[in-house]
């Protein structure tokens, strides 16, 4: 069968490539054409447009690049029409993808399947109308999305979470502490891991407070998980003259050797939980308490970390915006390092999260459902 996929950013490229690999096993004659990236291209098929030429986030960047944005929309529509796939598969990236869903469904009558739901449970809930109209099947990777969509009388399939898959096959899963510190020239002291984000603005806002708070725990060494694409020189402006180390491309290995972690919100909070490392979730943004109150008003959820969202209760402490202070981080870090009951309680919460996430196999489960559904038409 013929498959057209659209992924508009790096994470989508990764998830779509895994899905393509699984689709080939279900359908050895699969033909692919796609908007995506290098990982998708490595699975075979035709790359029509690289996501690096599409990644305009926010009102101003879109406005400044409106000609390119409109060109990409026209190109995608005409290419889908010419290829006329058996199914259009969309991966997150809702601003662009919901336009394509409408076009494929209303103009071409092509089945539309969505892998990885847009986060409409957090903001822009009005997008549910377009999803109900134009998306035939939604494959979710977050279990709490099921009741959200049920509330809107729309049935979705939870297929598992890709992070569980990544954890299950990660290398060095049995690595010893001595081996890790020797390879990375670290001290023979327990580790507090610092995961300060993936973008320079995030790191600049979060890392200094993380270092200040964690430095109080002198029996521990501080180790930063360096983000991909960020140079060591950038980090050195924050750690120069301080007893802080950094490792690159070893985040999972660092976490599993750590006694605790300070983590910015995002997938990293879930990865830390799956590896059973106690954590404090930290996130700084401009605007202080006013921005925080506005942020909480706009968001439709009680929590920002995936761990707490999946558990539907507070498992990990979230120190956001004006609550993210050196003193608050020190207090919470002290609890998860030195209070056995607190550590035990958090690990029990992690176990409940892991139970709700289920077993590995998210892309494989989605691929089976896609192929079976299209063949049944």
Could you describe each region identified by the protein language model?
Residues 1-377:
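Nucleotide-activated sugar donor-binding and catalytic core shared by glycosyltransferases
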């Amino acid at each position: 069968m013929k498959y057209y996929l659209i992924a508009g950013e790096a994470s989508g490229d990764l998830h779509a490539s895994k899905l393509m690999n699984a689709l080939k096993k279900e359908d050895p004659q699969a033909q692919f054409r796609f908007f995506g990236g290098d990982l998708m291209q490595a699975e075979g098929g035709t790359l029509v447009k690289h996501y690096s030429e599409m990644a305009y986030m926010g009102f101003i960047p879109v406005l400044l690049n409106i000609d390119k944005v409109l060109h990409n929309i026209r190109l995608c529509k005409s290419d889908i029409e010419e290829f006329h796939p058996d199914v259009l598969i969309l991966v997150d990236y809702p601003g662009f993808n919901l336009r394509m869903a409408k076009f494929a469904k209303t103009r071409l009558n092509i089945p539309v399947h969505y892998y990885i739901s847009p986060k409409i449970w957090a903001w822009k809930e009005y997008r549910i109308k377009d999803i109900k109209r134009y998306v035939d099947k939604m494959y979710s990777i977050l279990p709490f999305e099921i009741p959200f969509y049920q509330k809107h009388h729309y049935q979705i399939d939870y297929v598992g979470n890709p992070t569980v898959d990544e954890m299950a096959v990660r290398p060095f899963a049995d690595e010893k502490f001595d081996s890790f510190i020797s390879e990375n020239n670290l001290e023979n002291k327990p580790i507090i891991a610092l995961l300060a984000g993936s973008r320079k603005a995030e790191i600049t806002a979060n890392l200094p407070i993380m270092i200040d708070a964690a430095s109080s725990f002198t029996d521990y060494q501080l180790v930063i998980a360096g983000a991909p694409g960020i140079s060591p020189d950038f980090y050195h402006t924050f750690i120069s003259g301080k007893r802080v180390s950094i490792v690159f491309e070893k985040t999972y290995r660092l976490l599993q050797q750590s006694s605790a972690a300070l983590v910015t919100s995002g997938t990293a909070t879930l990865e830390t939980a799956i590896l059973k490392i106690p954590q404090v979730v930290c996130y700084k943004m401009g605007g202080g308490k006013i921005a925080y109150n506005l942020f909480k008003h706009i968001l439709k959820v009680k929590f920002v970390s995936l761990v707490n969202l999946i558990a539907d209760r507070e498992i990990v402490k979230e120190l956001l915006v004006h609550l993210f202070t050196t003193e608050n981080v020190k207090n919470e870090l002290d609890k998860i390092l030195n209070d056995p009951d607190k550590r035990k309680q958090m690990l029990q919460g992690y176990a409940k999260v892991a139970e709700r996430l289920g077993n590995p196999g998210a892309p494989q489960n989605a691929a089976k459902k896609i192929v079976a559904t299209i063949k049944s038409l």
